[in-house]
Design a protein with these regions (language model features):
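Phosphate-backbone binding interfaces of nucleic-acid-interacting proteins
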Residues: 1-227, 256, 349, 374, ...
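Mobile "lid/hinge" segments at catalytic clefts and subdomain interfaces of large enzymes
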Residues: 126-148, 155, 169, 173, ...
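Class II aminoacyl-tRNA synthetase-like tRNA-binding/catalytic domains
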Residues: 120, 313-366, 521-656, 718, ...
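Glycine/proline-enriched, intrinsically flexible loops and inter-domain linkers
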Residues: 4, 10, 22-24, 52, ...
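A carboxyl-terminal module marker
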Residues: 21, 471-478, 617, 645-649, ...
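Extended, well-folded interaction surfaces typified by the phenylalanyl-tRNA synthetase beta subunit core
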Residues: 195, 446-450, 454-614, 839-841, ...
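Conserved mixed alpha/beta core segments that line enzyme active sites in large multi-domain catalysts
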Residues: 47-89, 271-272, 289-365
Length: 872
């Protein structure tokens, strides 16, 4: 949240700057606008002077005040004589008194929660308005009494200048919107007003004043302390389990402030700023630490100094340790959690005070009786904090900043700001002997060649401008005479580590819209466009869509219920399935071995929502476990794996072939008075596969399976395997087609005779001869069409008979189509009639009667070899 009034503390902004314009200025340097939150309060809300307040005890024991309040001539009542008189208002606040200046919400005003102010009769009077508290105006949580303007942080001259009827909307900033921006993970420094002000300066050139510069002037100098002079508290950092070799805490700064007034409260201006930032006011010490965090970006934690025993120890948690955090929740800690401990009764680091950088514990917290406060200002490893926050589900404001990276030089300045505010507002005495355990590493110098900007971003930028930009973002820049700079990034920019990072900064601050659009000058070598496999995949999708199927994408996760629904043995299938270590759903821990299993779920959901005739298809990967594959190594986080580790990872991955699957249900045709109302069956799935083959230039072979070898999920008499013909072999199996088993239909609530197919496209690509297809010349000679009807054994497949006709027809065959299948009383048992429509055509001549008679005899002879006779 960005409050323009707060932003003015660090950077000069023009008068009348709106949130809309501020958002545009920040977007220019990469800080994206999320939302502009308009005020929830509308007037009239004015200053009122309490002329009199008459206490009136009530039957319920409560005392209310019947008040007459002067709200200015514009808003005062008018008596019977036309004279302006104060308004009568009921107020139950205990701090109401005559002579006070208060905030009056008049009829027509709207308060947060869409609370409308209207005249109303209460306690025997007409209350013509309301005297408001902080909570009612959305300025804070205080509801113990109404706002008394003399206690609201105004100087005597400012208070005396307040007149009845003055507009409070602007006076208390009630009409000010606030800008919410999105901070990307690499821009953690912008998670503060200090950082946002710097970015506003980078965008507009407005004068920026870093608050840390002034704070550093007042920090106690630790070098040269008198010998034996004790610091506020001893600190020991003992990390015996660093993550990736990086210690969890490389700087811990502790500073005390004593004799703080325990009854002191946060001033109104601070409570208002915290409220507008979305934080709740708690106590002076806690509010100050939150305020400093929002202002500078350094999370702080306040301890009751009298409750903790030194030394403070920063270490990893031990197995079995527990911590009750400030939100009242108990957490079982792990050996990866970084914790802050103290040492009661001399037991070194034995008591856990809090989760470092995430949230403090109940013990040692600041209370209403705390007088001596210890401020913790530390720098923690982002990876360690992020893991702890996620493990314990505590996404605190502190952890959000630490996991994005905090300035390693900011800790003393943040503590100085905190103790100064506590001293000014609570009368405390800041210590001159803080303890600073500093193990931070010096940033590495980046050797940066200026021509990288041109090479990477395409921007022509002169050396002086490059130097100015890098200096302006806080870098120390040296050299440049030969086009090469030595650049030391600032401590608040942990994202700047390589030359490419500096190129990105230069491009960002010049403006991405300034990068010219240029066609690459290097000639394109080799083939462009889609690969052959991509073209085939697209053709398959187009063909299925043209057939009326709708593409679907399903999650690839399956479980026992899916196996059972498809009549599969759970134990056997799970052994050969890839199990996920951290599944999204515990009841689906495996990856699918075929698409049909997950596609069926999509079809079922659509049917349950009242749709009918649902036919879906999906192109996607399946996952086949390899029992001989090596175990996948555990790779470190935030560190690039070695080539050997990547090779081992690749070797352990399961095979992931590309499949296409379809599931068709309901009616085969659109409904209507001309429709046949035929249900989908196996023939529709076979037709779909056949059309796919024709679309991609492959003549698929459909071979019916014997009932005893049909997979359990499929209908034993209406299932076939799909093969790709390959010279010199019996073909390559690439899939299955047919109807689902009736029990599967019932298990999944699918209509009867639901048809499906699944093809292995990876195997198809490997078997195909992918090369340009030579187009056949169009013959100008007339075709000859003849019908053949054969009586054949029922065991003879139509495909086998069709192949015999093709072989006998030779080059004269143009097309063949099965148009009738008959089984009935006119034929003996075990026989059926198969009728084909065949078209013949020669490329170079008109076919003669003699030629056609010869072809017909050849076809008849080939059919007889299969025990099929021509019907006459």
């Amino acid at each position: 949240m960005v409050d323009i009034d707060w932003l003015k503390d660090h950077v000069e902004v023009p008068d009348g700057l709106t949130c809309e314009q501020l958002a545009k200025d920040l977007v220019r340097v990469g800080l994206e606008e999320e939302e502009i939150h308009a005020s929830q309060v509308t007037g009239p809300i004015v200053v009122g002077y309490v002329v009199d307040a008459t206490p009136e005890p009530q039957k319920n024991g409560k005392t209310i005040n019947w008040c007459h309040i002067d709200v200015g001539d514009k808003y005062n009542d008018v008596d019977a004589n036309g004279k302006k008189v104060p308004r009568g208002i009921i107020c139950g606040a205990p701090n109401m008194a005559a002579g006070e200046k208060v905030v009056v919400t008049l009829p027509g005003a709207v308060l947060p929660g869409d609370f409308k102010i209207e005249p109303r009769k209460t306690y025997g009077h007409i209350s013509d308005g309301m005297c408001a508290s902080e909570r009612e105006l959305g300025l804070g949580d205080s509801h113990n009494g109404i706002i008394l303007l003399r206690e609201y942080g105004f100087s005597k001259a400012e208070y005396d200048a307040l007149k009845p009827g003055d507009d409070v909307m602007d006076l208390l900033h009630l009409n000010k919107p606030i800008l919410e921006i999105n901070i990307t993970p690499d821009r953690g420094y912008a998670f503060s007003y200090r950082g946002v002000a710097r970015e506003y300066h980078n965008s507009t050139g407005a004068v920026y004043k870093d608050p840390v510069i002034e704070l550093n002037k007042d920090i106690p100098v630790l070098d040269g302390l008198p010998a034996g002079e004790p610091t506020d508290i001893d600190v020991s950092i003992e990390d015996n389990n660093p993550i990736h070799g990086v210690i969890g805490c490389d700087r811990y700064y502790a500073r005390a402030i004593r004799n703080v007034d325990a009854n002191a409260s946060s001033p109104q201006w601070m409570r208002r700023r915290l409220t507008r930032a979305g934080m709740r006011g708690i106590s002076l010490a806690v509010d100050v630490t939150n305020y400093v965090m929002l202002d500078l970006g350094q999370p702080l934690h306040a301890y009751d100094l009298d409750k903790i025993d030194g030394p403070i120890v920063v270490r990893r948690a031990r197995t079995g340790e527990h911590l009750t955090t400030l939100d009242g929740k108990d957490h079982e800690l792990t050996e990866e959690d970084l914790v802050i401990c103290d040492s009661p009764s001399g037991n070194h680091g034995s008591r856990v005070l809090g989760l470092a950088g995430v949230m403090g514990g109940m013990y040692g917290e600041v209370t209403s009786e705390t007088k001596n406060v210890l401020i913790e200002s530390a720098h923690f490893d982002p990876v360690s904090i992020a893991r702890t926050a996620r493990r314990h589900k505590i996404p605190s404001e502190a952890s959000r900043r630490f996991e994005r990276g905090v300035d390693t030089e900011l800790q003393p300045a943040a503590a100085q700001m905190a103790v100064k505010l506590l001293a000014d507002l609570g009368g405390g005495n800041p210590s001159k002997y803080p303890n600073d355990v500093n193990n931070t590493q010096q940033r590495s110098v980046i050797v940066f060649k200026a021509d990288e900007v041109k090479r990477v971003a395409g921007l022509d930028v002169d050396l002086n401008r490059i130097s100015d930009i890098l200096t302006d973002i806080g870098c120390s820049v040296a050299g440049g005479g030969n086009g090469s700079f030595s650049v030391l990034p600032p401590t608040w920019r942990p994202d700047l580590n390589e030359p490419c990072d500096l190129v990105e900064e230069i491009a960002r601050l010049i403006g991405y819209d300034e990068i010219p659009v240029k066609v690459p000058a290097v000639p394109i070598v080799g083939k462009t466009g889609l690969t052959a496999e991509q073209s085939i995949r697209r053709a398959i999708a187009y063909e299925l869509a043209e057939m009326g199927l709708v593409e679907s994408l399903s999650y690839p996760f399956v479980g026992e219920e899916d196996f059972k629904a498809f009549r599969q043995d759970v134990d056997e299938v799970s052994k050969v399935s890839v199990r996920i270590a951290n599944p999204l759903a515990e009841n689906r821990p495996w990856l699918r071995r075929n698409i049909l299993t997950t596609l069926a779920g999509s079809v079922r959901r659509n049917l349950h929502r009242g749709l009918s005739d649902v036919s879906l298809y999906e192109l996607g990967h399946v996952y086949l476990a390899d029992p001989k594959a090596p175990a996948i190594p555990a790779l470190p986080g935030c560190v690039r794996p070695t080539d050997a580790e990547l090779a081992a990872l690749d070797a352990g991955l399961p095979d992931q072939p590309l499949h296409v699957s379809a599931l068709m249900t309901g009616k085969a045709e659109e409904t209507g008075w001309l429709a046949t109302h035929r249900d989908v069956d196996w023939s529709d799935a076979v037709e779909a596969v056949t059309r796919l083959g024709k679309r991609i230039g492959v003549d698929f072979e459909i071979r019916q399976l014997s009932a005893n070898v049909v997979p359990a999920s499929w209908h034993p008499g209406r299932t076939a395997k799909v093969y790709v013909p390959v010279d010199g072999s019996d073909g390559v199996e690439i899939g299955i087609v047919g109807e689902l088993h009736p029990q599967v239909d019932e298990n999944l609530d699918l209509p009867k005779h639901s048809a499906a197919f699944e093809l292995d496209l990876t195997a198809l690509f490997a078997s195909m001869c992918i090369k340009p297809v030579q187009a056949k010349p169009v013959s100008t000679f007339p075709p000859v069409k003849q019908d053949f009807a054969f009586v054949a054994p029922s065991s003879l497949t139509a495909r086998d008979l069709e192949d015999a006709i093709k072989k006998a027809s030779g080059d004269l065959l143009e097309s063949i189509e099965l148009f009738d299948v008959y089984e009935g009383e006119q034929l003996s048992d075990g026989l059926r009639s198969l009728a084909y429509s065949v078209t013949f055509r020669a490329k170079d001549r008109t076919l003669s009667g003699e030629e056609m008679e010869s072809v017909r005899e050849s076809i008849t002879k080939s059919a007889k070899e299969l025990h099929a006779t021509l019907r006459v």
